[in-house]
Amino acid sequence: GQDDIFVAKLDSSGNWLWTKQAGGTNYDGGYSIAIDSYGNSYVTGYFRGTASFGSTTLTSSGESDIFVAKLDSSGNWLWAKKAGGTDYDYGYGIAIDSSGNSYVTGYFQGIASFGPYYKTTSGGSDIFVTKLDGDGNWLWAKKAGGAYYDYGYSIATDSSGNCYVTGYFKETASFGDINLTSSESYDIFVAKLDSSGNWLWTKQAGGTNYDGGYSIAIDSYGNSYVTGYFRGTASFGST
């Protein structure tokens, strides 16, 4: 098709071990990958129309849908799941906990289904965070955002199964019972959810220009490290 998804594995010396392809006749892309303790890989991104992941075929409900897929250490497709609705929906970040559950973030527009869980945007696009078990069953889905366009870009987990998300939002956005208001344009957010999908806290950073969080990582003490970009002057707490 136009663009296809690939997943590739190299050994520690940089030798190519295998490469796998997925997709269809339209535009399809992989955005993030994570590995569990058994060497299985988990991938998320988007696809349009009909896309094949090994013997599994998915068909999007609208312009583009989210996919979450699992491969074993030899590159065999184990399962592939889709989420989304009739508009544009993208998976941007994925992380795995010690039990093999996958956590995914990105954005959706309009009404989107994550297995049995349906979410409706508050505005142009909303952030989603969703959890699947090791067999690809949807466990929960949460949304955040407001009346404008809001995006989740990266997600990480700690040893207790909490997940941490970063991205950006504009104007007022709700993260559960927590409301944030951007300084003027887009601001960075960092949020923590527990293993059941409850929002524990959300923080913002930025200034009056465009600011965004693009990647997040967690250390063994539960500290989160975030990177992205800012323009002009930006505040990060008291710094």
Residue ranges of predicted features:
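A sequence-level/structural motif corresponding to short, flexible coil/turn segments enriched
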Residues: G1-T239
